[in-house]
Amino acid sequence: MQALLFLMALLLPSGAGAEEIIGGVEARPHSRPYMAHLKIITDRGSEDRCGGFLIAPQFVLTAAHCKGREITVTLGAHDVSKSESTQQRIKVEKQIIHKNYNVSFNLYDIMLLKLEEKAELTPTVDVIPLPGPSDFIDPGKMCWTAGWGKTGEKEPTSETLREVELRIMDKEACKMYKHYDYNFQVCVGSSTKLKTAYMGDSGGPLLCAGVAHGIVSYGDSHGKPPAVFTRISAYVPWIKTVINGK
């Protein structure tokens, strides 16, 4: 999980080239109650971070490249450097990576985290809805992403949640990414604006009209948009199967 192929460059956990928010603003505290902060102990024993989001009381959705030896999820957080009264810290019982995940091509970059216990749903901890399996977001639509990643190539990761509004791009805008697949991925962020997810933001959501349509996956190692997000609608049947224990 080192060097997100930003992925290895852009969206891995912060130490691995993961993404953060560039060109955004600090989110209003607890305005995104589905957001999850992932503290990851890698297979090598180092510490990384990713984002994720709560889709059921006992399940967090994130990117497969955020896998690790051990993961602790913090829900209800705004400033992850503090022990806020709203926070719920829950260890991950099981990491469920899509069986077709390909780290070389950055495809099927999706993972479900089953928590050791159900989260208590509160005004600051809540789930976010997913799209239907046939729901595609059209190019030109404006959506949001959020995370605790870096705010610049040479900047540290953010301790407070940040957010940025991004434009959904036509697939041609991501043609520089050799293995980009429109059916399974979303091209996000105009190349004319320095706004994107960046290192440390990996696994966070792409939010369109209150629905999670994407997962931060990878992009340019220097944080230049567009970036690639996993298209959630393509995986809705798999997600439902895992959550329902089938």
From Swiss-Prot:
What name goes with this protein? Mast cell protease 1
The residue ranges of the Peptidase S1 domain are: 21-244
Q: Any idea what job this protein has?
A: Has a chymotrypsin-like activity.
Q: Which GO terms describe its molecular function?
A: serine-type endopeptidase activity
What keywords sit in the KW lines?
Disulfide bond, Glycoprotein, Hydrolase, Protease, Secreted, Serine protease, Signal, Zymogen
Report where it is expressed, by tissue.
Answer: Mucosal mast cells.
Task: Give EC number(s), comma-separated.
Answer: 3.4.21.-
The gene from which this protein is expressed is: Mcpt1
Please name every pair of cysteines joined by a disulfide bond in this record.
50-66, 143-208, 174-187
